[in-house]
Amino acid sequence: MKTKVIVVIGPTAVGKTALGIDLAQRYNGEIISGDSQQVYRKLDIGTAKASPEEQAAAVHHLIDVRDVTEGYSAYEFVAEAKALIADIKSRGKLPIIVGGTGLYIQSLLEGYHLGGLVDQEQVLAYRAELDCLSDEDLETMAEQAGLMVEGNSRRRIIRGLELKKFGENLENTESGYEPLYICLTDDRQVLYDRINQRVDKMMAAGLLDEVSWLYQEHPEAQAAMGIGYKEFFPYLEGQISLKEAIDNVKQNSRRFAKRQLTWFRNRMAVDFYQVSEEAVKDRIYTAVEEFLDD
């Protein structure tokens, strides 16, 4: 029997953290963070990490598990999340994944799996490379590789290219999970306004101090490349004004939110929930309860 997993996804600033905590409390669950930046210790504000009070309200995993000097990959996330899901289930609780890093979550819950640990790391690295390509470039690669993909589905093209590259080492096996995807969204302008307001709140909470520490101590770290950090480096070097840096964070965050929604819409079988819609919580509760009772 497959393990049932609730998955709360959506663009940045849409309200995933609050919903995840609500569901964990209501359905005896524990939260696994599906965010590639929240793994880093000391980077609390810019990553919009759940506050100490929020983390006390529900058990959270995969937050503060890496130093900023360390890298983090989809392969590491998959390995650690699998172990956590098994542990959470063994204690009679419900695994709830909350985050916006689509590649990590999809790699865990869907797709092909390799037998060897080294091969698994290689295929996830290759998948990340393919994900950076445009639809047009992927279709060109598929044609060059002689792939015939029905409907030119981006996800099928990527899987086909993975099969072509890794051949018999790549097995089309079931993931062992039965996910219920709850994708939060909102009207674009409402979401963009919320993003802008959150950046302002981050600044008031001390984001610049957090960025300054990272810039002084570990400017070359993978963690420093995240949105909310890298935009301030030109300001700290005297190249742009603070207002320009803040505006760049807001703009990049809005663009990231748009990319996230495109990812979830095109590559994962998700149900969308408009957070500003009346009674949206009741709809979500009903979906979860029907899923768990099935």
UniProtKB/Swiss-Prot annotation:
Superkingdom classification of source: Bacteria
Stretches the record annotates as Interaction with substrate tRNA: 35-38
Cofactor(s) of this protein: Mg(2+)
Binding sites annotated in the UniProt record for substrate: 12-17
Molecular function terms from GO: ATP binding; tRNA dimethylallyltransferase activity
Quaternary structure note: Monomer.
Entry protein name: tRNA dimethylallyltransferase
Organism lineage string: Bacteria, Bacillati, Bacillota, Bacilli, Lactobacillales
